[in-house]
Amino acid sequence: MRKGSIRLIAAASVIALAITGCSSSSDEAANTDTEFEIFTWWASGGEAAGLGALVDLYKAQNPETEFINASVAGGAGVNAKAVLESRMAAGDAPDSFQAHAGLEVIASYAAQGKLEDLTALYQSEGWDKSFPADLIKQTTLDGKIYSVPVNIHRANVLWWNPATAAKAGITKAPETLDEMFADLEKFKKAGVKTPMVLAGGEGSWAMAHLLDYVLVASMGPEKFEGLFSGSTSWTGPEVAEALKVYQRLLSYGDKGKNSFGWGEAGAAITKGTGGFFIMGDWASAQWQNEGAVLGTDYTFAPGPGTVGIYQWLSDTFTLPVGAKNRNAALAWLKLSGSKEGQDAFNPLKGSIAARTDSDLSLYDDYLKSAAADWAKDRLVGSTAHGVTADNKFMASMNAAVGKYISGGAKDNAGLAKDLAAAQAAVVK
């Protein structure tokens, strides 16, 4: 298996040590709880629709349990995570909360003793056979598993409007960064209002998301992963070159000062006023929820420079230490990890299932394409969505990007130094 990859295979032997002698902390009991509170940042659009499908199943299976949806709006959880931290510090943890697989789960929560060990639940539900072995590793610390993946998202997606592209003389998706810049010039000459759609609101996470993609596209996956292993320097020539690409991309937007959230900004694609948009595949679910049609109002391709690369993230659910309605939470986790639950949730959420046995006939053409790429592409974790970075680094990255944009997107060296300082602080 190639470095950094997570394949759609079930390798039970890889997880065997974690299962052997596992904790009994997640031993199931009948759900006699009268309430259940879930905490996410899925408050609108396709995200809320996906959550709603899962909630409907839960209510049908647990009719005596009142469902409490404690969603906090804000893309990538920029608002929700702050609220969650305050609640957990005050001893008021929700019964289950959303967290990204990778360092977000492992370093931000599990290593802090905030989550229950779910290894026994994995054994009882057979998830060691139905989830990819390497994905399970992304929720595992010291042999114990701490969250349940409900999906896989792709971060490095290029979106555009076919009719707008045709008017600009663009007949195929750009595959390289140079080709993308050539097409941006075509959009500009054709009078497209915003050749490069930018989303600068919601705590700058969407601009950090764009930077994360640019780093992979410019440097390649090995150099990118080296930023977190220490083999690539944040202040070295590779990052310097990537930041020139980033700076140039921003020049095709609203001078890097767009204050729209990702949903409002992305509407420029389906309305035909925007050229290209780099955003995760939750955008497709959002647009479909708004009535747009895939293939007519928008289409997709891997981000230029990342053809054959799948920059991934995974939403998972947890069992916090001290959850008031523990049995109700266990019922939610079992549903979230089930085939029925994942195939109800993901087609509406705009993601593919984390399970290996998903029924792809329920998914649209984009998601079928994503599933095929997930099975064969070089996989690279998302920084902006918690795979390669914990909450502390993500917050620092958002702040560094916000500072860069507010300064006119001119201080590339300063941005590199801020990112290096953020990584150094995490390592310490």
Stretches with model-predicted labels:
Residues 1-37, 60, 421-428:
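Short, low-complexity disordered leader/linker segments with a strong preference
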Residues 41, 55, 244-328:
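Extracytoplasmic/periplasmic substrate-binding proteins
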Residues 57-131, 138, 166-169, 175, ...:
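Extracytoplasmic "Venus flytrap"/periplasmic binding protein-like
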Residues 94-95, 125-163, 194-198, 299-300, ...:
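A structural signal for short loop-to-beta-strand junctions that line the ligand-binding cleft
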Residues 106-111, 135-172, 181, 200-226, ...:
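Periplasmic solute-binding protein
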Residues 119-131, 175, 196, 200-201, ...:
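Short, solvent-exposed loop/beta-turn-alpha elements that line the ligand-binding surface or hinge
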Residues 184, 228-258:
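Glycine-centered hinge/linker elements that transmit conformational signals in sensory
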Residues 351-354, 370-424:
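C-terminal capping/gating helix-and-loop segments adjacent to ligand/active sites or protein-protein/ligand interfaces
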